[in-house]
């Protein structure tokens, strides 16, 4: 996803910017909004094609861009209210954002705090942790070109590194924003033996022709094994797995021509490691996260990803996982 030479976010992704904010009070309903959004998409890509035509451009949008500045303002209200209730005046308002895209959320939050509570604004520090060098440069460019750059520059720090390479210890209370980030973290593919219930971890082999081949191994790597142990120990109620109930397994095992293994389950091992980072280096953090609760057109499996690309302004889904080029997994 972030490889500097061929990664999705480093080389292929373009974040949609709709131009002027939508006037939602004048939009009649959902279908009208989607019609207007389609028009903005067309206009945006037309402008891009004037200077850099690209049939394979990977264009995507975020709630921050679609609902600006209101989305950022709503988050800013929450941050300021909680800061003043529990931390003010003994601590500064320190905000970390991971995966900041164009930097729009940062600008909307800082604009709102400056305009509504200048005393808090003077004590606000906004730090972006951005793994992609190209996006970090874009965030700084957008900040410098903002009409409020002169005021905001002293409040912003853009740190171009992976959160998983983080090593500074941050003892101060802080808010940590992760909006539509978790779905981009890597997951491990696990399938189970219907007879024994034992898990197997998926891997990929690349042959001499560059073709991908999937295989499964009974020996789990330490990270996947730890996730399964932690989930089992921490779960307060039953959680879904591809195995299903023992009763249903015993019935299906007696039926003829049944597959030996389940459909894969995609476990969020990288998310677990992110929580380790928060625990080890941001002990006084407060996490604010948002993400998808479901994905359309996902490939088969539990918690399965969407694998797709974009070609000639159309989204093209792929029914299997091992697709290389511009796919987003």
Q: What is each stretch, according to the model?
A:
Residues 1-96, 102-173, 190:
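Rossmann-like AdoMet
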Residues 171-329:
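Class I S-adenosyl-L-methionine
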Residues 100-101, 181:
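Beta-hairpin (beta-strand-turn-beta-strand) motif
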């Amino acid at each position: 996803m972030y490889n500097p030479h061929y990664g999705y976010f480093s080389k292929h992704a373009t974040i949609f910017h709709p131009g002027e904010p939508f006037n939602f009070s004048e939009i009649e309903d959902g279908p009208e909004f989607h019609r207007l959004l389609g028009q903005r998409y067309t206009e945006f890509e037309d402008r891009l094609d004037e200077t850099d035509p690209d049939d394979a451009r990977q264009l995507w949008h975020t709630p921050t861009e679609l609902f600006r500045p209101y989305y950022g303002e709503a988050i800013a209200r929450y941050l300021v209210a909680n800061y003043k209730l529990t931390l003010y005046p003994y601590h500064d308002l320190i905000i970390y954002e991971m995966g900041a895209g164009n930097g729009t959320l940062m600008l909307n939050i800082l604009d709102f705090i400056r305009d509504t509570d200048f005393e808090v604004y003077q004590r606000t520090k906004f730090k972006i942790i951005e793994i992609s060098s190209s996006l970090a440069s874009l965030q700084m460019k957008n900040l410098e070109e903002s009409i409020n750059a002169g005021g905001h520059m002293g409040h912003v720090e853009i740190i171009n590194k992976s959160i998983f390479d983080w090593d500074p210890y941050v003892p101060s209370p802080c808010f940590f924003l992760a909006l539509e980030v978790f779905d981009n973290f890597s997951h491990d593919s696990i399938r189970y033996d219907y007879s024994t219930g034992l898990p197997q971890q998926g891997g990929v082999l690349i042959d001499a022709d560059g073709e991908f081949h999937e295989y499964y191994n009974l020996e789990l790597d330490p990270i996947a094994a730890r996730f399964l142990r932690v989930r089992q120990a921490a779960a307060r109620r039953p959680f879904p797995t591809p195995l299903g109930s023992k009763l249903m397994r015993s019935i299906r095992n007696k039926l003829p021509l049944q597959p030996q293994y389940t459909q894969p389950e995609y476990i969020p091992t990288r998310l677990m490691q992110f929580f380790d980072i928060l625990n080890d280096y941001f002990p006084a953090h407060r996490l604010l996260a948002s993400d998808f609760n479901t994905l359309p057109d996902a490939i088969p499996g539990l918690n399965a990803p969407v694998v797709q690309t974009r070609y000639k302004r159309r989204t093209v889904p792929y029914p299997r996982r091992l697709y290389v080029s511009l796919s987003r997994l």
